[in-house]
Curated annotation (Swiss-Prot):
GO cellular component: neuron projection; neuronal cell body; plasma membrane; Z disc
Catalytic activity: K(+)(in) = K(+)(out)
Taxonomic lineage from the root: Eukaryota, Metazoa, Chordata, Craniata, Vertebrata
Protein name: Small conductance calcium-activated potassium channel protein 3
Bias kind Polar residues: ranges: 105-125, 232-249
Function text: Small conductance calcium-activated potassium channel that mediates the voltage-independent transmembrane transfer of potassium across the cell membrane through a constitutive interaction with calmodulin which binds the intracellular calcium allowing its opening. The current is characterized by a voltage-independent activation, an intracellular calcium concentration increase-dependent activation and a single-channel conductance of 10 picosiemens.
Entry keyword set: Calmodulin-binding, Cell membrane, Coiled coil, Cytoplasm, Ion channel, Ion transport, Membrane, Phosphoprotein, Transmembrane, Transmembrane helix, Transport
Compartments (UniProt record): Cell membrane; Cytoplasm, Myofibril, Sarcomere, Z line
Cell membrane keyword on record: yes
């Protein structure tokens, strides 16, 4: 075996190792070399072990002789091939590295590779397979002159050779051949592919033979491409496969990623996406804070052309650039998650028009910021009460500073990614089963359900402060009386607009201030409706409180019904008393009791109507758990009754079986009774016969029976009625 990983033929089944493997380049050099002695003929199976011969140099004449001998050689017996199953397999030779089968040129390794060095076998299985595999042999051109065999650990399965199939199947089922590399798990294949190509040299020994692996042709082709790609001495043979050999590892690595790797990679992407969102929010809020500081300081302390303003604007620009990079990285993680979740091969599949538009809009919103430098424009407005036009020179930074508050949408993203409902696996699984989309809207709904007051308070205060500062910035160039340009005055204007009061003592002058007030009024109307809903929910009775209230009302109505019924009976008795029992009828008292009687009847009817309404209201309060308990009680009672019925039916069946057995035994009892009576009668007749004989009376027998009585005269259970 040479350093390039090739075996050279030196005979039938012989492998010769030469570290240099010289190849004659011309006919003169081939004639100068002396031909080696002819190879020894193959020994029979029972021949003793022979020492290995000296290393031979491959010559053209010798190669022709070897080919003729190999064609004339009979097939080897299968008993020689089956003995390889008892040889141990070294686990480290499973790698597909080209150096895994290299061995130093020593006598021990040569003797081991020689087929006659093993007891009881004349042919190595690896040599036999390589000799019968046309895909592993290559004949060089006329200038090369030599036939070499590739030393690959993977051996092709030949369907046309029945001996190879029988030997391989025998070794496979007996444990002599390991499973192919293509059938390994994806994790082991990833580990094999991840290992470097440079493996330590493995020495061949009787206790450590090379492993033979049976695999498919596709795997052999891929691994042979990987084996021959690093060898510089075979670049002229594999020039066409160099480009394809670089693509095979990537394709195999992508295909061999199992579900465990994908889940781990997906979890890592989730964590990276959350950290990127946090960093983006930090830099976005930092830019807003620096923008507010720069705007306030440039209005009161220094001008826009100072170094302090330039430094703060440069800081804002730097934070904006970092923010844009974080947003790009965030959406990159989003695309990677889409590829993993949907099993896509190309990331461009995830880049839909909607996603591209969303990313572009987000980049545009986050890219707006004050540009370093001093830029001004003339701003014309009309004053509110005097309706006179006002023209002032304003900074362009106002137009670029106010849209920076749109970066606050990052807060909703961070809330979503940090929510327990979004990060918890159990909640995500339950939501997926119920077809719930975990987005920002769902998280806000849960927050409004859990703590509605806190959410509304934080939202209202934040909107109040931001809108007041925006109105102050918009109105300070045209407010000569310092009314709306004052921060406290702007807060008063926003508050009365938010609550939809509108006193009219303060009004904005510019369209910028009017637009902010319009948005504030819309937000105020929505927040007011939410506050009313939250207050109504807080004032509403709970289910337990409603049950208690209904119980108390039912008790009071029951008492009122009893009182009304008692009043009806009382007035009925009094009417009967004054009309029937008294001698002199007092019509005034009768009419009085009749009025009270009618009032009692109407009161009884009204109380019953209230009780009916209360019962209807109570029926609507029956929740699912109570209904479930009632149904459970009913089902339990039905089960108990069915069990009792089954017990009764079982007792009846046992009694019927007892009666049936009694009726079946009745004929036997009757037969036994009749038999006993017949025996008693016969015994009585025998006694009477004995007494008559003793007296000396001559008796003529009536029949052939010894007692003179025919047996047919006495019926038995087995005789018919006609014989009696």
């Amino acid at each position: 075996m040479d350093t390039s990983g090739h075996f050279h033929d030196s005979g039938v089944g012989d492998l010769d190792e030469d570290p240099k493997c010289p190849c004659p380049s011309s006919g003169d050099e081939q004639q100068q070399q002396q031909p080696p002695p002819p190879p020894p003929p193959p020994a029979p199976p029972a021949a003793p072990q022979q020492p290995p011969g000296p290393p031979l140099q491959p010559q053209p004449l010798q190669l022709q002789q070897q080919q003729q001998q190999q064609q004339q050689q009979p097939p080897h017996p299968l008993s020689q091939l089956a003995q390889l199953q008892s040889q141990p397999v070294h686990p480290g030779l499973l790698h597909s590295s080209p150096t895994a089968f290299r061995a130093p040129p020593s006598s021990n390794s040569t003797a081991i590779l020689h087929p006659s060095s093993r007891q009881g076998s004349q042919l190595n299985l690896n040599d036999h397979l390589l000799g019968h595999s046309p895909s592993s042999t290559a004949t060089s051109g006329p200038g090369g002159g030599g036939r070499h065999r590739q030393a690959s650990p993977l051996v092709h399965r030949r369907d046309s050779n029945p001996f190879t199939e029988i030997a391989m199947s025998s070794c496979k089922y007996s444990g002599g051949v390991m499973k192919p590399l293509s059938r390994l798990s994806a994790s082991r294949r990833n580990l094999i592919e991840a290992e470097p190509e440079g493996q330590p040299l493995q020495l061949f020994s009787p206790s450590n033979p090379p492993e033979i692996i049976i695999s498919s042709r596709e795997d052999n082709h891929a691994h042979q491409t990987l084996l021959h790609h690093p060898n510089a001495t075979h670049n002229h043979q594999h020039a066409g496969t160099t480009a394809s050999s670089t693509t095979f590892p990537k394709a195999n690595k992508r295909k061999n990623q199992n579900i465990g790797y994908k889940l781990g990679h997906r979890r890592a992407l989730f964590e990276k996406r959350k950290r990127l969102s946090d960093y983006a929010l930090i830099f976005g809020m930092f830019g807003i804070v620096v923008m507010v500081i720069e705007t306030e300081l440039s209005w009161g302390l220094y001008s826009k052309d100072s170094m302090f303003s330039l430094a703060l604007k440069c800081l804002i620009s730097l934070s904006t650039i970092i923010l844009l990079g974080l947003i790009i990285a965030y959406h990159t993680r989003e695309v990677q998650l889409f590829v993993i979740d949907n099993g896509a091969d190309d990331w461009r599949i995830a880049m839909t028009y909607e996603r591209i538009l969303y990313i572009s809009l987000e980049m545009l919103v986050c890219a707006i910021h004050p540009i370093p430098g001093e830029y001004k424009f003339f701003w014309t407005a009309r004053l509110a009460f005097s309706y006179t036009p006002s023209r002032a020179e304003a900074d362009v930074d106002i137009i670029l500073s106010i849209p920076m508050f749109l970066r606050l949408y990052l807060i909703a993203r961070v809330m979503l990614l940090h929510s327990k409902l979004f990060t918890d696996a159990s909640s995500r699984s339950i939501g997926a089963l119920n077809k719930i989309n975990f987005n920002t809207r769902f998280v806000m709904k849960t927050l409004m359900t859990i703590c509605p007051g806190t959410v509304l308070l934080v939202f209202s205060i934040s909107l109040w402060i931001i809108a007041a500062w925006t109105v102050r910035v918009c109105e300070r160039y045209h407010d000569q009386q310092d009314v709306t340009s004052n921060f406290l005055g702007a807060m008063w204007l926003i508050s009365i607009t938010f609550l939809s009061i509108g006193y009219g003592d303060m009004v904005p002058h510019t369209y910028c201030g009017k637009g902010v007030c319009l948005l504030t009024g819309i937000m105020g109307a929505g927040c007011t409706a939410l506050v009313v809903a939250v207050v109504a929910r807080k004032l509403e009775l709970t289910k337990a409180e409603k049950h208690v209230h209904n119980f108390m009302m039912d008790t009071q109505l029951t008492k009122r019904i009893k009182n009304a019924a008692a009043n009806v009976l009382r007035e009925t008795w009094l009417i009967y008393k004054h009309t029937k029992l008294l001698k002199k009828i007092d019509h005034a008292k009768v009419r009085k009791h009749q009025r009270k009687f009618l009032q009692a009847i109407h009161q009884l009817r009204s109380v019953k109507m209230e009780q009916r309404k209360l019962s209807d209201q109570a029926n609507t309060l029956v929740d699912l758990s109570k209904m479930q308990n009632v149904m459970y009680d009913l089902i339990t009672e039905l089960n108990d009754r069915s069990e009792d019925l089954e017990k009764q039916i079982g007792s009846l069946e046992s009694k019927l079986e007892h009666l049936t057995a009694s009726f079946n035994s009745l004929p036997l009892l009757i037969a036994d009774t009749l038999r006993q009576q017949q025996q008693q009668l016969l015994s009585a007749l025998m006694e009477a016969r004995g007494v008559s004989v003793a007296v000396g009376t001559t008796h003529t027998p009536l029949s052939d029976s010894p007692i003179g009585v025919s047996s047919t005269s006495f019926p038995t259970p087995y005789t018919s009625s006609s014989s009696c």
